[in-house]
């Protein structure tokens, strides 16, 4: 059974009042999370930190933020108390508020997080998902609140774009999750967690949450460069995957300026169908997309592009489609992830039969491409691929019952 914790409903009134006061103060103070080294130097200079100290202070702060995972200046014991007070008076470390935490029966976590407004209107809510696996743990990170792409099979696409997330908000999803899972030195893991104590919990990041990362290029770039910085979070760029639906002009730039692994939401082998499934194809058709993929910087057998392909019954799952997919990807070092369609209320598609998915995969495998079938994770908490949607647009009870009915047979076989 999935476990759900609604944090905002269980807090006492005094805590709510205190949190509101803190949030009001945070709206007025600059966050240091998400700043580059040089930007942090400038921020410290602006409050009067002596010039000869700024680089040292930045190194200290970087270590506390990204190696130790602290969320309070008071925890930074190697910084003098007067300096800590100066930092507290001028800056913030504003971790998001947990609105709801859900834990799937398969161990997947989904968090609904609320970020303060910070001058951007009302507070916004986004969803972040953690997927534990054998020898690894993957965090699925959002880049936007909502999405503009309206892919017809994707639940997230039914939520209109509210705004882009900042580099701070993208990074804070990772910092929050590592703290929550006890993944920083000296941090306790949750009482209800079954996660191993012996290894790093979050080994991989995938930019596959809410939104199109390449429509928020600068913030995503900044966040991922900080996440991969060797003096901080130190995630290998080989373990960070940026997923795009095909924003062709930014693909080459992403390879040159960010240098992480690339995934492409493909889902169709001809323009006429992809125009329906992934409407951005009308602007950047398959010929343009494939050309950009062939020219992706660093592309090699060791740095393959992952192509995501959702399996839709009687839509894109024929063996002829599989053969056309092989032809389409010819010459591109690639892996093809086959994704069983995850149902959601109001969707008009069905998942391909399992036997058909296996036959499809076999055709691709025989052509020399790896084509793993992605086992659905977190379906019972709407954390599976294509299911994310912030709870500012929560499911009505009738919709949730409909979803449970739709998924009943599938869940029993996983």
From Swiss-Prot:
UniProtKB keywords: 4Fe-4S, Cytoplasm, Disulfide bond, Iron, Iron-sulfur, Metal-binding, Methyltransferase, rRNA processing, S-adenosyl-L-methionine, Transferase, tRNA processing
Location relative to the cell: Cytoplasm
Enzyme Commission (EC) number: 2.1.1.192
Cofactor requirements of the protein: [4Fe-4S] cluster
GO MF annotation, one: 4 iron, 4 sulfur cluster binding
Binding-site list for S-adenosyl-L-methionine: 211-212, 243, 265-267, 342
Disulphide bridges: 140-385
Described function: Specifically methylates position 2 of adenine 2503 in 23S rRNA and position 2 of adenine 37 in tRNAs. m2A2503 modification seems to play a crucial role in the proofreading step occurring at the peptidyl transferase center and thus would serve to optimize ribosomal fidelity.
UniProt-recorded name of the protein: Dual-specificity RNA methyltransferase RlmN
